[in-house]
């Protein structure tokens, strides 16, 4: 009898482990499906007196790219974003995530700025609201 409780706990933990190991860690279900986009109001990278807000994106199909000067994969995708920015039917916006403003400005100056506007999110709060877990 004294072994039944630890055995039961072990079996339950083993079942959770078995189910958890079967899940794909790359598949994250979006918490925003069928919900309105969260509101935001952030200064722009290139002009902190100007703001970018959710309302600026309404009424048109927009692509919002989350990027940072320290992000390696952002450097790889940047040439594609530069090409996309030349197409008239794509509204491309950036969300600079957890970065330093001077580094972000320097990165855009060095590599080119494909965005109609890029919001500056130094704390990462807006990115988290949109489900960003990394760049």
Task: Describe each model-derived feature in a short phrase.
Residues 90-103, 113-124:
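Thiol-based oxidoreductase modules, predominantly thioredoxin-like and allied folds used
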Residues 2-3, 109-114, 121-135:
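Thiol/disulfide oxidoreductase modules built on the thioredoxin-like
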Residues 36, 60-62, 66-70, 134:
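Short pre-active-site segment immediately N-terminal to redox-active cysteine/selenocysteine motifs
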Residues 22-23, 43-49, 117-121:
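Short gly/ser/thr-rich secondary-structure transition/capping motifs
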Residues 40-63:
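A short beta-strand-turn-helix
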Residues 83, 103-110:
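Short alpha-helix adjacent to the SAM-binding motif of class I
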